[in-house]
């Protein structure tokens, strides 16, 4: 039976669960022997929607709470005895690719032709090379807008134009906050960037999301095989276009972030070297897994792996995937100012895009903490960090931050001082002896 139909043949599931109950001693049952009826009622199981019938548009039209419950139930059912096996791998010729040129123009091709297209671009790989892997189809306006903002921000970054923190029409993503005056900290930081050397580079967009036209493909995507395909292409860029691994940065969203991890491992297997950085933008849950192997993104898949989580109970996951994981408003259910789980997931892309614009690299100060409550009570520990393009490569652990519900999303002002870290330096700064915690 097609494992996807497990949700449509619930009577059979319940019957099997009942048989297992009589055929096995509970004390000897392993963790994978959990039955659906152990945590869902028969009525809930019978009301479950088949994964074949769920669309991105339906999730967008649901309330955040309803969509989260639906996704969580399907995810947990898929994990019981590995009910879903990964089976979908897009053909390389069907994966659209776009190479952005320094003048803002783009070259359209597909994954099969990526390396040849790169060879035709003058000076490709002389500077930073960013590989952006999309994770959802742009049939969603939220996905389309987020991806557009990211590409625009990279073009601005690579063209060396400084973007003011406030008061610029291009920066104002339709927010009334865009006309507010800059704070003193914003002005000081913006002034400091006037003498900064601009960054140059190449942007390649692998539009994996366009192949995930329904929830079935999304759920059944073979993360490892798809990542291996992209990893081999990156090796070709190194071998045939002289792109060294230390300048390759993969930025990937949603399920694409999990694919990026597999791509990084494949690159290392074939070259013996690691990619410089992988940035995960709201990495998703993995529904279909090989029961005999670990899959998805993890620290060690690149020299540095950082992740931004904005929809932990919806499209994303609260599972740590990087050297450093940033949780916006803590491991909360959804990003502030969003109305559905798709929009919430895309906020990670919007935040990262904002940090790319020259002058905004430190718009998202964060503090090492285990919860939002710890952050709000100034009980975080460790040094201040910045989420986004300016994240320090020596960071480790979980970081919490707050953001604005509308753009500009970054708080911009420095993070609040935390007692455990900054308090140790008060007596040195003031020249007075004070009791420390």
Swiss-Prot record:
Q: Which Pfam families match?
A: Lipase
Q: What's any one GO cellular component for it?
A: extracellular space
What triggers production of this protein? By beta-ecdysone; in males.
**What's this chain's function?**
Vitellogenin is the major yolk protein of eggs where it is used as a food source during embryogenesis.
Tissue specificity note:
Synthesized in the fat body and ovarian follicle cells and accumulate in the oocyte.
Keyword Membrane applies: no
Q: Where is the signal peptide?
A: 1-19
Entry protein name? Vitellogenin-1
Give the keywords, sorted: Secreted, Signal
Q: Where in the cell is it found?
A: Secreted
């Amino acid at each position: 039976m097609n494992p996807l139909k497990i949700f449509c043949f619930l009577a059979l599931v319940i019957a099997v669960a009942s048989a297992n109950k009589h055929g096995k001693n509970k004390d000897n049952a392993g963790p994978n022997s959990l039955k659906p009826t152990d945590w869902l009622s028969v009525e809930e199981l019978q009301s479950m929607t088949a994964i074949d019938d769920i669309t991105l548009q339906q999730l967008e039209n649901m309330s955040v709470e309803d969509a989260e419950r639906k996704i969580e139930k399907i995810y947990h059912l898929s994990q019981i005895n590995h009910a879903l096996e990964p089976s979908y791998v897009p053909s390389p010729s069907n994966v659209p690719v776009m190479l952005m040129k320094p003048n803002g123009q783009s070259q359209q091709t597909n994954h099969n032709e990526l390396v040849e297209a790169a060879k035709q671009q003058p000076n490709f790989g002389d500077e930073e090379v960013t590989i952006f892997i999309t994770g959802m189809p742009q049939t969603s306006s939220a996905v389309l807008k987020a991806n557009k903002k990211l590409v625009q921000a990279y073009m601005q970054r690579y063209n060396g134009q400084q973007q003011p923190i406030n008061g610029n029409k291009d920066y104002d993503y339709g927010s009334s906050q865009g006309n507010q005056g800059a704070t003193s900290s914003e002005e000081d930081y913006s002034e400091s960037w006037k003498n900064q050397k601009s960054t140059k580079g190449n942007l390649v967009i692998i539009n994996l999301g366009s192949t995930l036209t329904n929830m079935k493909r999304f759920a059944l995507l073979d993360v490892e095989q798809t990542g291996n395909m992209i990893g081999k292409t990156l090796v070709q860029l190194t071998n045939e276009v002289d792109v060294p691994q230390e300048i390759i940065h993969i930025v990937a969203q949603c399920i694409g972030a999990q694919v990026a991890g597999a791509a990084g491992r494949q690159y290392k297997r074939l070259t013996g070297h690691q990619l410089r950085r992988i940035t995960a933008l709201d990495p998703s849950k993995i529904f279909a897994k090989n029961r005999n192997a670990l899959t998805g993104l993890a620290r060690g898949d690149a020299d540095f792996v950082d992740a931004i989580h904005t929809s932990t109970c919806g499209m994303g996951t609260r599972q740590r995937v990087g050297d450093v994981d940033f949780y916006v408003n803590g491991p909360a259910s959804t990003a502030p100012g969003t109305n559905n789980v798709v929009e919430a997931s895309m906020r990670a892309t919007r935040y990262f895009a904002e940090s790319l614009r020259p002058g905004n690299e430190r718009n998202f100060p964060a503090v090492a903490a285990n919860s939002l409550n710890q952050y709000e009570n100034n009980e975080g520990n460790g040094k201040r960090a910045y989420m986004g393009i300016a994240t320090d490569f020596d960071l480790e652990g979980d970081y919490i931050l707050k953001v604005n519900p509308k753009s500009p999303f970054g708080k911009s002002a420095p993070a609040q001082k935390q007692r455990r870290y900054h308090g140790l330096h008060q007596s040195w700064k003031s020249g007075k002896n004070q009791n420390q915690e």
